[in-house]
Amino acid sequence: MSYKFPNNLKYADTHEYVKEENGLLKIGVSEFAIDQLGDIVFVELVEKGTNLQKGETFGTIESVKAVEEVYLPFAGEVLSVNESVIDNPEILQNDPIGNGWLLIIKPESNVLLDELMNSDEYKSKVSPN
């Protein structure tokens, strides 16, 4: 499978992506990680208004192969939860970078997106040598 690695995203070691939009952060899971999971059957996410610390679990993704936790790369308050991926996990599977985003957070403080991998670094990490 050929994966997309948009230049406007940053990636955590745990395969979450971050997209900055007007000072807020949209969080999701990379195409690579979603593909590795296989058919997704269930998504559970924290509630809107939840305050989370960096590295804290904000949900789980269950597939026919495994149950994986997803982690927040930066501390912040959850402003929005993508209810459509909870109601229809296929959205996450089919369009993880577009309509399959998971959360929008207001970061606790100024975040250093450069702490995360850029698209080229992430592509190198997940691509076979």
UniProtKB/Swiss-Prot annotation:
Tagged with keyword rRNA-binding: no
Superkingdom, natural source: Bacteria
Pfam families, per the entry: GCV_H
Modified-residue entries (N6-lipoyllysine), positions: 65
Keyword GTP-binding: no
GO cellular component, one term: cytosol
Keywords: Lipoyl
Domain Lipoyl-binding: 24-106
Self-association and partners: The glycine cleavage system is composed of four proteins: P, T, L and H.
Function: The glycine cleavage system catalyzes the degradation of glycine. The H protein shuttles the methylamine group of glycine from the P protein to the T protein.
UniProt name for this protein: Glycine cleavage system H protein
Organism in which the protein naturally occurs: Prochlorococcus marinus (strain MIT 9515)
